[in-house]
């Protein structure tokens, strides 16, 4: 009984902490990823254009920078500008899940947190990227994360719509997606 109460308390905490995040019943969707993915072409700076809201990204001018480390892993540096003008950042590492699907990565930001999926569903490497992540919770429901990224702070609306259509066609709800403010943003390190 105590274990059940602890589990229910933890779930209630998850729901309370995840306001705005996309919780759904059932297991995670399994969308196809970018074919013939080339991580070397993916490296560099990406600007967040839209996302399914997350509890861990609340600022504006959100940027991600990917670089190859000596150990073969990918260094991930995510940065955002807070309302008070300070830069919030987190650094992590991404690694391929398996070599047959190099667009399926796992990213880890802290030694005490589990790795999270980071799947590149679509990219042309020079303009846009569509990233999806999903975490299944006790086999009852899942939480979705999705990001539309661009090499520049803006992306044509027709490109954004096309990327959202990829998500929708794979049963990933885009109704909660929000635009990331990239107006008058500095280039973060």
UniProtKB/Swiss-Prot annotation:
Coiled-coil ranges per UniProt: none
One Gene Ontology term of the molecular function aspect: lipid transporter activity
Main location: secreted
Keywords: Disulfide bond, Glycoprotein, Lipid-binding, Pyrrolidone carboxylic acid, Secreted, Signal, Transport
Localization (cell): Secreted
One BP term from GO: response to reactive oxygen species
One Pfam family per UniProt: Lipocalin_2
Signal sequence range: 1-20
Other comments on record: APOD is primarily localized in HDL (60-65%), with most of the remainder in VHDL and only trace amounts in VLDL and LDL.
PANTHER family (UniProt xref): APOLIPOPROTEIN D
Family, similarity comment: Belongs to the calycin superfamily. Lipocalin family.
Annotated protein name in UniProt: Apolipoprotein D
């Amino acid at each position: 009984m105590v274990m059940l109460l602890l589990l229910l308390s933890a779930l209630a905490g998850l729901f309370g902490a995840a306001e705005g995040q996309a919780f759904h019943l059932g297991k995670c969707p399994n969308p196809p990823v970018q074919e013939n993915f080339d991580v070397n072409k993916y490296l560099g700076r990406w600007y967040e254009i839209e996302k399914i809201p997350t509890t861990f990204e609340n600022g504006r001018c959100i940027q991600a920078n990917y670089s190859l480390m000596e150990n073969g892993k990918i260094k991930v540096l995510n940065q955002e500008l807070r309302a008070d003008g300070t830069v919030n950042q987190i650094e992590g590492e991404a690694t391929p899940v398996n070599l047959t699907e190099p667009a399926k990565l796992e990213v880890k930001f802290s030694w005490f947190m589990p790795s999270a999926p980071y799947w590149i569903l679509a990219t042309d490497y020079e303009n846009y990227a569509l990233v999806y992540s999903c975490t299944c919770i006790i086999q009852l429901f899942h939480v979705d994360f999705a990001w539309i990224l661009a090499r520049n702070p803006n992306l044509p609306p027709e490109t954004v719509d096309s990327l959202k259509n990829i998500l929708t066609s794979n049963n990933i709800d885009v109704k909660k997606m929000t635009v990331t403010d990239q107006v008058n943003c500095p280039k973060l390190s």
